[in-house]
Amino acid sequence: MNPLALTIFLLSLAIGTTITLSSFHWLLAWIGLEINTLAIIPLMTKTPHPRAIEAATKYFLTQAAASALVLFSSLISAWQTGEWSINSLMDLPMNILSIALMMKLGLAPLHFWIPEVLQGISLPTGLILSTWQKIAPMALLLQTSHLINLNLTIALGLTSIMVGGWGGIGQTQLRKIMAFSSIGHLGWIIVILKFDPQLSLLNFVLYIIMTAAMFMSLTTISATKMLEISTSWSKTPALTTTTMLILLSLAGLPPLTGFTPKLLITLELVKQNATLLAVMVMFISLLALFFYIRLTYVVTLTLSPNTPNSLLTWRTASRSYSTTAIMNTMALILLPITPTLLLL
């Protein structure tokens, strides 16, 4: 792709998200979401492959339907209250808006587009889709968290955690595994949204850090299938080791970063007398833990047959991977500074 065109599309992504984050008017928020949607489609079709075209089409249709629902809910709200303010929503438009934003995020049972879209695009575009594209809808959900229906968030959150774990078990494609991982993590974020929006925000930030680190590692290794990542040990042992630890962090095992949100959410649910919900969330999450540990086993504990000559790979001038190293570090060792993060 032309570097100038790429710069314009990336700037459009940044501008769209910024407009949505800084808006108090529903029309401006909707415009920001639309700019975001339209800016990423050329990035998806950067490689003219039928799978990429199919992924971009599915993404556009889903996001267009969700944007129509956002506009519909804001029109109903303006008709009922006479205001276009984001915080002046009645029950019906709030429920419609919640469903629309959760469709944009890819929460179950509105998750049908995420695995197929991620499978059809490149890893760098998948990184943008899994992290940056979720900021604007999540910001709108956080702004309206005091109005959102508690039963709706709990139902969709539990469904997402279950679908995220169940769907990832039989997968061998790493992008689909990351798609179901994203669905599961967003389920955790939505479950706690009504109880403690600040904790949802912390969980979302940590989700972005861990997901970005995983996508950057996969991009560096150039792995899109489980077979490819299982043979990467002989080429990049250090990066493969950190990739294994990031997988365990995504699974939520202590003492890694991913344990932080799960611990805090469980404690908050118990504090809010929702102990049964906390137990259900933890038990359902064991499904996701299974496929994370399975992938970890494939990455580190299985070595493909290779001769000593295969270890001597041709080495060109090495590129700097400082950003990947920084993200990997943050995805692993943020647990000790959690009290500091909570005070920010």
Swiss-Prot record:
Gene assigned in the entry: MT-ND2
Enzyme Commission code(s) on record: 7.1.1.2
Purpose: Core subunit of the mitochondrial membrane respiratory chain NADH dehydrogenase (Complex I) that is believed to belong to the minimal assembly required for catalysis. Complex I functions in the transfer of electrons from NADH to the respiratory chain. The immediate electron acceptor for the enzyme is believed to be ubiquinone.
Entries under PANTHER family matching the protein: NADH-UBIQUINONE OXIDOREDUCTASE CHAIN 2
Source organism: Aquarana catesbeiana (American bullfrog)
Lipid bilayer topology: Multi-pass membrane protein
A Pfam family it matches: NADH_dehy_S2_C
Name recorded for this polypeptide: NADH-ubiquinone oxidoreductase chain 2
Gene Ontology molecular-function annotations: NADH dehydrogenase (ubiquinone) activity
Ranges that cross the membrane: 1-21, 24-44, 59-79, 94-114, 121-141, 150-170, 177-197, 201-221, 245-265, 273-293, 324-344
Protein location: Mitochondrion inner membrane
Family to which the UniProt record says this protein belongs: Belongs to the complex I subunit 2 family.
